[in-house]
């Protein structure tokens, strides 16, 4: 038999303090979850989950050919915070936005591998990945540069463009500059 070293009244106070700490921790955890969810919701959803990705790419290629541009496929989804951050980043930086608009047809190609999306969407996702050279191996978002004929010129792992919790303007601008039609002709 062990004899408690603290009197019963002290044990009761300790239990009360422990319960208060548990409640405080639970509240902080709930606040953190809500803030995390709101941070993702604050970014604009840029992926159209309803369209066929192959048809989306074909349409972009027609536009690119007419404009003498390349196509950039940002493959990912609204489920991917880094995909939404990249989309937000390139539209807010004037130099990057101009570089993209002048040289590329930029599309957000939705990727949803889940069977819950339906058999047709799963088939479309697999066909899109095959057509783009299996870019999913690099994670998301992944950037695929196509020439106006649909040939894959480059697949970019976007993690190399990151800086902190965002992206490096210098790296992103250099990436786009190196894959413009003019850069490949020189």
What is each of the regions a protein language model found here?
Residues 37-41:
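Boundary at the C-terminal end of the N-terminal hydrophobic targeting segment
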Residues 97-123:
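Thiol-based oxidoreductase modules, predominantly thioredoxin-like and allied folds used
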Residues 24-33:
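Sec-dependent N-terminal signal peptides
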Residues 17-24:
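Positively charged n-region of N-terminal signal peptides that target proteins for export
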Residues 67-81:
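Short active-site neighborhood of thiol/selenol oxidoreductases, capturing the structured segment around
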Residues 138-184:
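Non-catalytic, surface beta->alpha helical segment in thiol-disulfide oxidoreductase systems
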Residues 84-99:
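Typically the conserved alpha-helix immediately C-terminal to a functionally engaged Cys/Sec
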Residues 53-71:
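A short beta-strand-turn-helix
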């Amino acid at each position: 038999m062990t004899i408690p070293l603290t009197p019963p009244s002290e044990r009761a106070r300790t239990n009360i303090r422990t319960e208060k700490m548990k409640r405080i921790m639970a509240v902080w955890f709930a606040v953190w979850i809500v803030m995390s969810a709101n941070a993702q919701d604050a970014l604009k959803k840029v992926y159209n989950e309803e369209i066929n990705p192959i048809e989306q790419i074909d349409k972009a290629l027609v536009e690119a050919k007419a404009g003498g541009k390349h196509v950039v496929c940002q493959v990912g989804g609204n489920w991917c915070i880094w995909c939404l951050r990249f989309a937000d980043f390139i539209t807010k930086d004037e130099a990057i936005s101009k570089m993209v608009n002048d040289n590329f047809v930029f599309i957000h190609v939705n990727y949803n591998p889940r069977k819950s999306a339906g058999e047709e969407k799963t088939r479309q996702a697999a066909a899109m990945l095959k057509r783009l050279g299996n870019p999913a191996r690099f994670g998301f978002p992944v950037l695929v540069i196509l020439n106006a004929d649909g040939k894959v010129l480059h697949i970019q792992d976007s993690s190399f463009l990151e800086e902190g919790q965002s992206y490096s303007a210098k790296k992103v601008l250099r990436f786009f500059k190196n894959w413009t039609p003019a850069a490949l002709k020189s």
